Swiss-Prot record:
UniProt organism field: Shigella flexneri serotype 5b (strain 8401)
Substrates-to-products reaction catalysed: D-tagatofuranose 1,6-bisphosphate = D-glyceraldehyde 3-phosphate + dihydroxyacetone phosphate
Family from the record: Belongs to the class II fructose-bisphosphate aldolase family. TagBP aldolase GatY subfamily.
Cofactor note text: Binds 1 zinc ion per subunit.
Protein's recorded name: D-tagatose-1,6-bisphosphate aldolase subunit GatY
EC number in record: 4.1.2.40
NCBIfam families, per the entry: cbbA (TIGR00167), PRK09195.1 (NF006626), PRK12737.1 (NF009374), tag_bisphos_ald (TIGR01858)
Binding annotation for Zn(2+): 83, 180, 208
Pfam families, sorted: F_bP_aldolase
GO cellular component: cytosol
Pathway note: Carbohydrate metabolism; D-tagatose 6-phosphate degradation; D-glyceraldehyde 3-phosphate and glycerone phosphate from D-tagatose 6-phosphate: step 2/2
Keywords linked to the UniProt accession: Galactitol metabolism, Lyase, Metal-binding, Zinc
Top-level taxon of origin: Bacteria
Gene that encodes it: gatY
Requisite cofactors: Zn(2+)
Length: 284
């Protein structure tokens, strides 16, 4: 079976000292680039989508595409619900065949976050679906949800253990100074906090907001326990900027099969770099 949960992927990464990249896809071309590049490099990857992406493309359509491409390339893939907040929405997508879920209740008080996440875990584990949850909040924007940088909360290491034990999650997304979107200046990551979290929690740890981070910072987070790296904005920016440039230089272009090639090439460079930064080439 080529469509898999992320649990084994991330456990393998934790044992092997590398990270699995989760690429947020937005259209067919993004998925083609991610899967083709990963297959060529024999690298494990996760195909992730926010609620907005699943609404845009359709859950059944995305599942069919991932399944078909995994079989075509003989390459295991996970399709993952990124930053989903509603139980009924998650349940419907799990019943449709999704095998990896992030329930994001990080905006709630600690006790309510635990309660909401545990409800999802109890349901998902009945279907052998892996569950990620977040403790603390990232700044920036994901879909229509805006978090003010000033109000963004970092993950508390001691609370992280309580949270993991109380909810039964399979992986924990931590906040240590990253944000959604690209950075105006280099972020200062709290590596000591991450090291502390690793001492309290033995689950695979997840880093959101990795677009634009330096190779050095990404590799340092992996050394300190990060097993999954999320990338979204970097792919979108590469796609859109390349497309704008091409159409500016070739105003006569009308065939998407032609003018999308430059955008795909730009995204391919991003995917290859992220796979290299994660150290997961040859690990699939």
């Amino acid at each position: 079976m080529y469509v898999v949960s992320t649990k084994q992927m991330l456990n393998n990464a934790q044992r092997g000292g590398y990270a699995v990249p989760a690429f947020n896809i937005h259209n067919l071309e993004t998925m083609q680039v991610v899967v083709e590049t990963a297959a060529n490099l024999h690298a494990p990857v996760i195909i992730a989508g926010t609620p907005g992406t699943f609404t845009h493309a359709g859950t059944e359509n995305l599942l069919a595409l991932v399944s078909a491409m995994a079989k075509q390339y003989h390459h295991p893939l996970a399709i993952h619900l990124d930053h989903h907040t509603k139980f009924d929405d998650i349940a419907q997508k799990v019943r449709s065949g999704v095998r990896s879920v992030m329930i994001d209740a990080s905006h709630l008080p600690f006790a309510q976050n635990i309660s909401r996440v545990k409800e999802v875990v109890d349901f998902c584990h009945r279907f052998d679906v892996s569950v990620e949850a977040e403790l603390g909040q990232l700044g920036g924007q994901e879909d229509d949800v805006q978090v003010n940088e000033v109000d963004a909360l970092y993950t508390n290491p001691a609370q992280a253990r309580e949270f993991a034990e109380a909810t039964g999650i399979d992986s924990l997304a931590v906040t240590i100074g990253t944000a959604h979107g690209m950075y105006a200046s280099a972020p200062v990551l709290d590596f000591s906090r991450l090291e502390n979290i690793r001492q309290w929690v033995n689950l695979p740890l997840v880093l959101h907001g990795a677009s634009g981070l330096s190779t050095k910072d990404i590799q340092q987070t992996i050394k300190l326990g990060i097993c999954k790296i999320n990338v979204a904005t970097e792919l979108k920016n590469a796609f859109s900027q390349s497309l704008k440039n091409y159409l500016t230089e070739h105003p006569e272009a009308t065939d998407p099969r032609d003018y999308l090639q430059s955008a795909k090439s730009a995204m391919r460079d991003v995917v290859s770099k992220v796979i290299a930064d994660c150290g997961c080439e040859g690990r699939a």
